[in-house]
A protein has these predicted regions:
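PP2C/PPM-type serine/threonine phosphatase catalytic domain
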Residues: 1-218
Length: 218
């Protein structure tokens, strides 16, 4: 099939936090599904080091298999990742508490579809700013949406409340995810769609000043 869009440039980085022995992030770098849509994803493991690392790897591997074997949809990929996590949990007791966040992007001809569970984020770069396209599944965001506490009051406890996930990919809970569907024309700038996926370790830096300059990445 003729590819509708070309992948011009890809960059990625990931490293464990100082308090972690292993890296709990896994990435699916941009690639094409069987219908020439562009797919990429990020997963950030939750919980103990061994199960967190394995859970995020398992979720990304499940998406990779889905890409190669059948018509891809974000919903089917999320369901396949959930099945893979459930199987991992059943196979080995040491992975019984396996859980991960998962954010998947599918760039179609006319739309960008994002499937989202947890607190990783999808951004688009427009006018030298990063615009957040997903909403965190955290206690902080939940309280913010409820509007019963002031933003100032919530901000005092932001770090603690942001670490409490309200949704994750795990056998312990029913699959529950957000689907974001955005016309691609709303995201493209000067003929380019510039998107980023980030786990909390990365976006905690950007949210302080989500703007690019000529020296941002120096």
């Amino acid at each position: 099939l003729l590819k509708m869009y070309s992948i011009v440039e890809v960059g990625s980085f990931s490293y464990p936090k100082p308090t972690k022995e292993v890296n709990e992030d896994f990435l699916l770098l941009p690639t094409y599904d069987l219908e020439s849509n562009i797919i990429f994803a990020i997963a950030d493991g939750v919980g103990s080091s061994s199960s967190a690392n394995k859970a995020s790897e398992c979720a990304i591997n499940a998406i990779s298999r889905t890409l190669r074997t059948k018509k891809f949809s974000v919903e089917s990929a999320l369901n396949d990742a959930k099945t893979a996590i459930d199987e991992l949990t059943s196979l080995d007791e040491k992975y019984s508490d396996s859980a991960t966040t998962l954010t998947i992007v599918q760039i179609q001809e006319k739309n960008v579809v994002i499937g989202h569970i947890g607190d990783c984020r999808a951004y688009v770069k427009k006018q030298n700013k990063l615009l957040q396209l997903t909403k965190d599944h955290t206690r902080y965001q939940e309280l913010l949406d409820e509007g019963e506490l002031s933003v100032r009051k919530l901000h005092q406890h932001r770090e603690r409340l942001s670490s409490i996930l309200t949704k994750a990919l795990t056998k312990s809970y029913k699959l529950d995810f957000d689907i974001v569907n955005i016309p691609i024309e709303n995201l493209i700038e000067d003929g380019v769609l510039a998107m980023s996926l980030m786990s909390d370790g990365a976006y905690n830096h950007w949210q302080k000043r989500a703007k690019f300059s000529a020296t941002t990445m120096n």
